[in-house]
């Protein structure tokens, strides 16, 4: 049997499917997720149910968002899971997660995410950060390194700044390729994202921060002065106490927020 076939389902490349098969890893992830009935539990991309089964067993109801129609049908006909699941067939990138919120219950979101959509999906989920208690995701190890990076490192970038603006980022465990069927060509890791109840550095307009980061990191090798000359003047950099000769990866989240807030003040 092809390594791409697992439990009778052929992994689809266009959906970035790699199915988790290592019981030890599965148990550790479920332990980190800590399923309970005090939150709305939401899984993105349940696939063949490696995480779905142990999580659903521990709670009354699990909401899942799955794009692949064949996998949705399997879940709908699953002898154990079908009565425990609320299934949304569709693209998580377009999904309105706020519709899942119940009064008095925040979301706990988790998933073994398709690596080809993981970064845009992170940005999409940050829009719902206020409704989310915790997020646990299996990602390409390189993406987890980017999420948790410190200023001055190669991995530090736009994703880092936005993730750390919204959430505390905690790497949980590394997962080797042989834990999946078919094995991916890259190492994987699980990350915990804890959205802040109160952000350490509040921004007046998060869209301005997002745009500023995109502009700053567009040309990583150039200085802030070069990249942001249309946005901030020499005097404004001086006022903020930020060295405009630094490169974008050398600037902290707090400093990016300070720059964005200055841009907001100018637009007011």
UniProtKB/Swiss-Prot annotation:
User: Which stretches are annotated as coiled coil?
Assistant: none
One Gene Ontology term of the biological-process aspect is:
rRNA methylation
Pfam families the UniProt entry points to: RrnaAD
List the subcellular locations: Cytoplasm
Q: Does the keyword DNA repair apply?
A: no
Supply the enzyme class, top level: transferase
Q: Quickly give the catalysed reaction.
A: adenosine(1518)/adenosine(1519) in 16S rRNA + 4 S-adenosyl-L-methionine = N(6)-dimethyladenosine(1518)/N(6)-dimethyladenosine(1519) in 16S rRNA + 4 S-adenosyl-L-homocysteine + 4 H(+)
Annotated Gene Ontology cellular component terms: cytosol
Q: Which InterPro entries match?
A: KsgA/Erm (IPR001737), rRNA_Ade_diMease-like_C (IPR023165), rRNA_Ade_Mease_Trfase_CS (IPR020596), rRNA_Ade_methylase_Trfase_N (IPR020598), rRNA_adenine_dimethylase (IPR011530), SAM-dependent_MTases_sf (IPR029063)
Keywords, sorted A to Z: Cytoplasm, Methyltransferase, RNA-binding, rRNA processing, S-adenosyl-L-methionine, Transferase
Which of this chain's residues are annotated to bind S-adenosyl-L-methionine?
18, 20, 45, 66, 91, 112
- Molecular-function GO terms, alphabetical: 16S rRNA (adenine(1518)-N(6)/adenine(1519)-N(6))-dimethyltransferase activity; RNA binding; rRNA (adenine-N6,N6-)-dimethyltransferase activity
The Swiss-Prot or TrEMBL record describes its family as follows: Belongs to the class I-like SAM-binding methyltransferase superfamily. rRNA adenine N(6)-methyltransferase family. RsmA subfamily.
What the protein does? Specifically dimethylates two adjacent adenosines (A1518 and A1519) in the loop of a conserved hairpin near the 3'-end of 16S rRNA in the 30S particle. May play a critical role in biogenesis of 30S subunits.
- Classification via NCBIfam families: ksgA
Know the name of this protein? Answer: Ribosomal RNA small subunit methyltransferase A
| Originating species | Shewanella oneidensis (strain ATCC 700550 / JCM 31522 / CIP 106686 / LMG 19005 / NCIMB 14063 / MR-1)
Q: What is the lineage of its organism?
A: Bacteria, Pseudomonadati, Pseudomonadota, Gammaproteobacteria, Alteromonadales
């Amino acid at each position: 049997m092809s390594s791409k076939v697992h439990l009778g389902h052929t992994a689809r490349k266009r959906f970035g499917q790699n199915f988790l098969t290592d019981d030890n890893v599965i148990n550790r992830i479920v332990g980190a997720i800590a399923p309970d009935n005090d939150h709305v539990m939401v899984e993105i991309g349940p696939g063949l149910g490696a995480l779905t089964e142990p999580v659903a067993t521990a709670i009354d109801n699990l909401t899942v968002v799955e794009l692949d129609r064949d996998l949705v049908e399997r879940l709908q006909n699953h002898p154990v899971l079908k009565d425990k699941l609320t299934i949304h067939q569709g693209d998580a990138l377009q999904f309105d997660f706020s519709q899942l919120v119940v009064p008095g219950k925040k979301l706990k979101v988790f998933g073994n995410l398709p690596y080809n959509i993981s970064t845009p999906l992170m940005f999409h989920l940050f829009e719902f950060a206020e409704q989310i208690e915790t997020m646990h995701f299996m990602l390409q190890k390189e993406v987890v390194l980017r999420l948790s990076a410190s200023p001055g490192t190669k991995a530090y970038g736009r994703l880092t700044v936005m993730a750390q603006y919204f959430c505390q980022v905690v790497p949980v465990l590394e997962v080797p390729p042989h834990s999946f069927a078919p094995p991916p060509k890259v190492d994987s890791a699980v990350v915990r994202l804890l959205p802040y109840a109160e952000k350490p550095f509040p921004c007046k307009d998060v869209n301005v921060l997002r745009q500023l980061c995109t502009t700053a990191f567009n040309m990583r090798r150039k200085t802030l002065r070069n990249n942001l000359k249309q946005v901030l003047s020499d005097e404004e950099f001086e006022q903020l106490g930020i060295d405009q000769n630094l490169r974008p990866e050398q600037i902290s989240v707090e400093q990016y927020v300070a720059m964005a807030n200055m841009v907001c003040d100018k637009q007011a």
